[in-house]
Amino acid sequence: LAGRGQRVVVIERKQYPFHRVCGEYVSHEVLPYLRRLGADPAPLAPASISRFRLSSPAGRVLDSPLDLGGFGVSRYRLDEFLYQLALARGVEFVLPATVAAVTFDAATDRHQVTLADGRHLTARLVLGTYGKRSALDRQLDRPFFGQRSPYVGVKYHLRLAGFPRDVIALHNFRDGYAGISAIEDDRLCFCYLTTRDNLRRSGSVAALEGEVLAQNPHLAAILSSAERLYAQPEVINEISFAPKAPVEQHLLMVGDAAGLITPLCGNGMAMALQGAALVAPLANQFLRGQLPRLALEAAYARAWQQQFGTRLRVGRAVQGLFGGPVLSELVVGALRHWPAGVRALMRQTHGQPF
């Protein structure tokens, strides 16, 4: 939008760079878009990933090539890279700052954005790009916010000699699964999703890993051999996969704020970037007076559902097949003998280059 001559202000509650709970794998479907933006990730020296490995809780393994493949890069490095590019193009940043409320004034056709420190901003258009869950969701009275979610996410960066840098592996355990893949330098991203009950029964993250994750022999080998590069893991709670609306009270939601794909599909970052590619030209038309607000909202909601609706539904269905030890064993066993089924599931949860 800044490249199209629009004034853009980004409000971020942290100071760049910083770590996020994220699998840090990006499908190659995003590369044409990033290159059009002048944001080719090649200078970040990402890992090139072309193979997928899936294991059951007992350790049975399925290997498959990735049709498009992807790259691995930390959010710490990627977000800082995009932040510096945006600054160079005139984007204004207000940080560290937290949005307390966003209201819409129909009389002026403007949004009022209130920050936690009392400052106010006025905007013709607000894009909600704030991730999985925020106090703003409560203020907007979004239905999913009032529904307790059983899921928690944990992330580390690791160093592990001998781990293949072209593989993204997904290892199942009781009531959860863990992903591991290479990022820049000699690092690995290790990120897992499990339930609050699993964590509560174990009493701590360390006990959970030793008692539950390590029942999968592949995870046991990783946890016993890897060097952990954080003093403490990044942890997030209340991860909801419930359907969300892409437009809320005239805010256009993008990325996880619009809908969270289950992490086992490995496509959240690509979906966020594709959401940006969908919203930017429509927002530009609106800001130039070429598209009324209601037409903008309808066009974006329609495009979003067409692009992502099926992916999210398939992701929720696939997640239901994993976590339970017996069902996970059966599914992995069946897919080992049905490689076409594996490729079909991947196509249902990923898009084409854009």
Residue ranges and their predicted role:
Residues 3, 32, 84, 88, ...:
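Short, well-ordered alpha-helices that flank and scaffold nucleotide-derived cofactor binding pockets
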Residues 120, 200-282:
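FAD/FMN-dependent oxidoreductases across multiple families
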Residues 85-222:
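Predominantly flavin-linked oxidoreductase catalytic cores and closely associated redox partners
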Residues 2-22:
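Glycine-rich FAD pyrophosphate-binding loop
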Residues 6, 39, 91:
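Short phosphate-binding/catalytic loops that engage adenosine nucleotides
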Residues 67-72, 142-144, 266-270:
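Short glycine-enriched, charge-decorated loop/helix-capping segments at active-site entrances
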Residues 281-354:
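C-terminal helical "tail/cap" subdomain of flavin- and related membrane-associated enzymes
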Residues 31-83, 104:
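A conserved beta-strand/loop capping segment in the N-terminal third of enzymes
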